[in-house]
From Swiss-Prot:
Gene source species: Lodderomyces elongisporus (strain ATCC 11503 / CBS 2605 / JCM 1781 / NBRC 1676 / NRRL YB-4239)
Subunit structure comment from the entry: Component of the eukaryotic translation initiation factor 3 (eIF-3) complex.
GO cellular component: a single term: eukaryotic 48S preinitiation complex
Main subcellular location of this protein, as a coarse class: cytoplasm
Record function comment: Component of the eukaryotic translation initiation factor 3 (eIF-3) complex, which is involved in protein synthesis of a specialized repertoire of mRNAs and, together with other initiation factors, stimulates binding of mRNA and methionyl-tRNAi to the 40S ribosome. The eIF-3 complex specifically targets and initiates translation of a subset of mRNAs involved in cell proliferation.
Gene3D superfamilies to which the protein is assigned, alphabetical: YVTN repeat-like/Quinoprotein amine dehydrogenase
A GO term for molecular function: translation initiation factor activity
Pfam families: EIF3I
Name of the protein described by the UniProt record: Eukaryotic translation initiation factor 3 subunit I
Amino acid sequence: MRPIKLMGHERSLTQVKYNREGDLLFSVAKDNAASIWYSSNGERLGTLEGHQGVIWSIDVDPETLLCATGGGDLAVKLWTVENGQCVYTWNSPSPVRRVSFSPDGKKLLVIADQVMGHIGTISVYDINRDTASLTNQAETASLVIETEQNGSKATVAGWSEDGRFIIAGHDNGYVSKYDAHTGELLKSLQAHGIHNEEKNVSVTDIQFAPEDRSYFITSSKDKCAVLTDVDTFEILKVYKADAPMNTAAITPLKDFVILGGGQEARNVTTTAESQGKFEARFYHKIFEEEIGRVKGHFGPLNTVAVHPDGTGYSSGGEDGFIRVHTFDKSYKDFLFDAERTEKAAAAGLD
């Protein structure tokens, strides 16, 4: 599984994202330009330049027509993927931590941080997708969800399958389900901070099941990742690691989840790499056991994304590199003991 190593950012990666077909990979970092790459060979298609500082988040719509970025420069920018033009900029009252298109691409969710006297918000903008008038976007949000009084700010968020719900992760370890049309808080659950004694329990990433978005995985500084059902809002599985986790993803085809993390940069020692803190960790989704690790980064993993067809994954690190991995045959053939027994029994019955 020899990866393609992409060197296009001067600073730490903050998010990597595939488009729906998986032929393009989008990346943002703590520098001020986003990059778009061909995922098959690592060739850079182009850059999106216009932000004045760190870009925290990027997303691409289902048609690969538009791309959105949000950053520390208090801006959310909308770009055309085809030619890299910025067609619209929304101003945010505080740094933008996450942007996410709804499954139909008609809405854009934006998390504004709870700093500088601003109360943390999740805003939803209606996106005009008419190619003749892309520069004509609604300036104000159609919905704003504010952090409750004395509540915990949202750090990450995403959409359920049909865009009915917005699921958010908070810095106190809770996950919340909101009505995407009214903004009403429907359910709240403490997903992190209950599996061990860790004090820092902030939710660092949220990614949904690739097949139907009916469940999602969250990673946290509490050294765990948690699988939660969207409808029942109950915890399904817990994956425990030995370092703070910055990112987690669910793989299609195989029942695996991938976790990435490592010590905070300021706490890193020379032994951290040899201890395997900076490896991508693969867990069995059902049995919750770690089944393997992939080395490569020289610092914590900040973001992972799985190719939509399940043939590989990409990781972005504190070291400024993106590594694009293609799974080999041993990955596709791997069976857990229980699965092997089940398969053998089924073969015996035929």
